[in-house]
């Protein structure tokens, strides 16, 4: 394996260009899986939101460096921060869906997943006026046991998913998944 400028060369024949992608999950501290047993969705409104101010700071940094990213946004955040959605889009960034309520796919069924993701997609598309093409599952929770979610995403009109990691982990990952598309 050899790195040459903007590409990798493997042996004599296999070569591919290096593509760097920056993606950001737009969620607040109380949404994370580590707090799921302590702070439930009905309690989220009791906590001060930090996601808006932190994301604005991040947008300023990206703008100074002329860097574009994909922001996978929770529908819950989009409902409460519509100006943030607009600012992300106006900065030339892509907006993807991170679902509505940051629920691990394995904790629900297909019907609940479809409802959550459809709700978020509708909110984001209404606010942006553009089609939301990408999706990332909360806590990367598409696993070998929840691959049915990919079919649902296709049925909802998503063009790509960014939820699968080729790693061993207690909550996420598909160890034998390919590292490259």
Listing of model-derived features with the role each one plays in the protein:
Residues 1-15:
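Intrinsic disorder/low-complexity segments
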Residues 14-134, 139-181:
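Catalytic alpha-helical scaffold of carbohydrate-active enzymes acting on polysaccharides/glycoconjugates
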């Amino acid at each position: 394996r050899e790195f040459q400028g903007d590409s990798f060369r493997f042996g004599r024949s296999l070569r591919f260009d290096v593509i760097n992608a920056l993606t950001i999950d737009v969620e607040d501290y109380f949404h994370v899986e580590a707090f799921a047993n302590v702070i439930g969705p009905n309690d989220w409104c009791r906590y001060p939101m930090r996601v808006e101010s932190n994301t604005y700071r991040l947008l300023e940094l990206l703008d100074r460096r002329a860097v574009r990213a994909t922001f996978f946004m929770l529908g819950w955040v989009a409902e409460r921060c519509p100006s943030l959605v607009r600012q992300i889009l106006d900065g030339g960034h892509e907006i993807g869906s991170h679902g509505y309520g940051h629920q691990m796919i394995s904790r629900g069924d297909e019907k609940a997943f479809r409802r959550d993701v459809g709700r978020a997609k509708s909110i984001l598309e209404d606010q942006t006026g553009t089609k939301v093409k990408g999706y990332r599952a909360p806590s990367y929770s598409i696993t070998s046991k929840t691959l049915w979610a990919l079919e649902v995403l296709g049925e909802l009109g998503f063009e790509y998913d960014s939820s699968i990691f080729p790693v061993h982990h207690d909550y996420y990952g598909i160890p034998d998944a390919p590292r490259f598309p």
